[in-house]
Amino acid sequence: MDIKQTAVAGSLESSDIMVTVNPSDVQGITVQLESSVEKQFGQQIRKVIEETLKHLGVKAASVEAVDKGALDCTIKARTITAVHRAAQVEVYDWKEIDSWNA
């Protein structure tokens, strides 16, 4: 999936995460994380974001995430939404997304 514009999903409320996806001129994914629980869960948060991007077929993007204690399912949902918005995709492949949980 090609990232065409900057897009945001989520909020800065407690138990949520704000994910911003930006286009990148170079191949690869960069994740910049800000979290009060980064020492305990930073590696897991990055892993969820990176795996979600991989499933979506994103090859080049810069991601900024501001975490406020979000669960993995919330991180995944916010990442999916931000990527679809950034790629200007209006149709979700729910069967494909659901198959990730198998």
UniProtKB/Swiss-Prot annotation:
Any one Pfam family match given in the protein's UniProt record, by short name = ACP
The answer to whether the entry has keyword Transmembrane is: no
Q: Which InterPro entries match?
A: CitD (IPR006495), Mal_deCO2ase/Cit_lyase_ACP (IPR023439)
Instruction: Please state where this protein is localized.
Output: Cytoplasm
Q: Which GO terms describe its cellular component?
A: cytoplasm
Assign the protein's first listed, main location to one coarse class.
cytoplasm
Q: Which residues carry this modification: O-(phosphoribosyl dephospho-coenzyme A)serine?
A: 14
Q: What does this protein do?
A: Covalent carrier of the coenzyme of citrate lyase.
Please give the subunit comment from the record: Oligomer with a subunit composition of (alpha,beta,gamma)6.
Q: Which family does it belong to?
A: Belongs to the CitD family.
Checking HAMAP family in the record gives: CitD
The protein's name in its UniProt record = Citrate lyase acyl carrier protein
Q: What is the species of this protein?
A: Streptococcus mutans serotype c (strain ATCC 700610 / UA159)
**Upper lineage:** Bacteria, Bacillati, Bacillota, Bacilli, Lactobacillales
Query: What gene does the UniProt entry assign to this protein?
Result: citD
